[in-house]
Amino acid sequence: MADLSFFFNPSSIAVIGASDTVGSVGYEIMKNLTEDFPGELYPINIKQKIIFDKPSYKSILDVPNKIEMAVIAIAAPFVSDVLEECGKKGVKGVIIVSGGFSEIGEKEREDKLLEISKKYGIRIIGPNCIGIYDNFSGVNTIFLSKDKISYPTKGKISFLSQSGAFAGLILDWTSKERIGISNVVSYGNKIDVNEADLLDYLCDDENSKVICLYIEGIRRGQRFMESAKRVSKKIPILALKSGKTKSGAKAASSHTGSLAGEDIIYDSAFKQSHIIRANNFEELFDMAKALEKQIFPKSDGVAIITNAGGLGVMTADALEMNGLRLANLGEDTIKKLKEQFPERVVVSNPMDLVGDADKERYEVGLKALLEDKDVGLIIVILLLQVPTLSLDSVDTVLKIKKSSDKPMIILGAGGEIITPYLKKLEEGGLAVYPSPERAARAAYALVNHAIVRGDIHRERKENIGVCKV
């Protein structure tokens, strides 16, 4: 596999088009790298001598030291000239954030860049992108001001996006949702480095446990499918594909120069490559959040335990709509629970502990379900507004979770008052969702990937691959 480490963890970076003009692209890139990147940083600007208290050079060729990676942020007509200079300098990788290429019909400009890339062996991300944010190495070429977006905590989810704006949005949104991110890559027109190259690289990245894709169109379909099929056996891959409609496909073409194609073809390609398709970005990260925990079921049977009967019924509906089945509880499990529970408790699946359930009742029910052979994972519904549940109940659930090798998903619906309860569950390593539909999406992602891994031996049904809710 091609080495792309110089993009994610370079020893030195040159910013061509660096600036100290507040609000400019070159300013924001320099500001972010100055604050985050621990390596050597070299501003390149033909007019300015000092930028961010660093000596600025008129050309990358004037820099006395070796440069591993460069970011180009200048007008499109001049990009090929500075790329040539990068080649002469021995730069390994270049991120071209500049727009003005095939997305506006200027394909000849891209052809020239590719010619230079092949001549010197330079790898290119872009053009028409915002580049890389790596939460571990400090690489941050995102030219969005930290005054306007928040950055997420460290996590194990990698996000690859053709759209730069969407990549920036994801950084801000995942921060708000308390979802940890490893890295975000915006690759734009992908004249060189594409989705397949990035999948191959991230497959061996210790900080990537889930890969999320935002795709507008794929050019080298067979190469992409081969990489995805290989990588998905090790790391779950989730994809959000836009351009489903004629209007969307037309918009994608003018946005990143993508050839969208019939959506049904992408649907089939994703299924063959074991990629889990999402319908929207909320769904994308709902599934990623569960998969990041790296605990996968050994059975496709799902158990529901609840103190709110209606939510249990809705969750059962949502699971079936996703092609999942409710676990068949064993006779021993049912007998044991009936002996310990009051008569009003419904001992079946869903298991309705009824509205006066306390932490002891949840503990008995959860332990029994975890011991049942047909139960692969459990959706724990907690109506935390009832007086019988408190923060102690959360501690009980977390204690049981730590002693089990079966995944547990939390459904906790409500408003601000229960937020501390849900936050504590998340901090304890559980994926938490506010509705039956979103909890079901997480369950289906876990079962889907367990089938791909070979942990569950069953055929992948047509509706195991695309969420139907």
Residue ranges and their predicted role:
Residues 1-469:
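Catalytic-core regions of core metabolic enzymes
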